[in-house]
């Protein structure tokens, strides 16, 4: 699967789940479960409830995603 196939959306962290998983509400109102990307994990980027994030979704499963950026 190529990187161009991913859908990027903005969202807000609703709650923190175990194993660095998060419940994220997207701009369109959908709620997805997302995990942190490897680069964010490697650089110890902290994500807290209420943070604005960018989430990548695949067209195959729109209920799960990957957090790739935390807005300031």
From Swiss-Prot:
GO terms for molecular function: ribosome binding; rRNA binding; translation initiation factor activity. Keywords: Cytoplasm, Initiation factor, Protein biosynthesis, RNA-binding, rRNA-binding. CDD domains: S1_IF1. GO terms for cellular component: cytosol. The keyword Protein biosynthesis applies. InterPro entries: NA-bd_OB-fold, RNA-binding_domain_S1_IF1, S1_domain, TIF_IF1. It comes from the Bacteria. It is found in: Cytoplasm. Component of the 30S ribosomal translation pre-initiation complex which assembles on the 30S ribosome in the order IF-2 and IF-3, IF-1 and N-formylmethionyl-tRNA(fMet); mRNA recruitment can occur at any time during PIC assembly. This is Translation initiation factor IF-1. It comes from Shewanella pealeana (strain ATCC 700345 / ANG-SQ1). The gene is infA.
């Amino acid at each position: 699967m190529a990187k161009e196939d991913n859908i990027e959306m903005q969202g807000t962290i609703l709650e923190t789940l175990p194993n660095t998983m998060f419940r994220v509400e997207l701009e369109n109102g959908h709620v997805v479960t997302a995990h942190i990307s490897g680069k964010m994990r490697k650089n110890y980027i902290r994500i807290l409830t209420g943070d604005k994030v960018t989430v990548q979704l695949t067209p195959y499963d729109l209920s799960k995603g990957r957090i790739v950026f935390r807005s300031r």
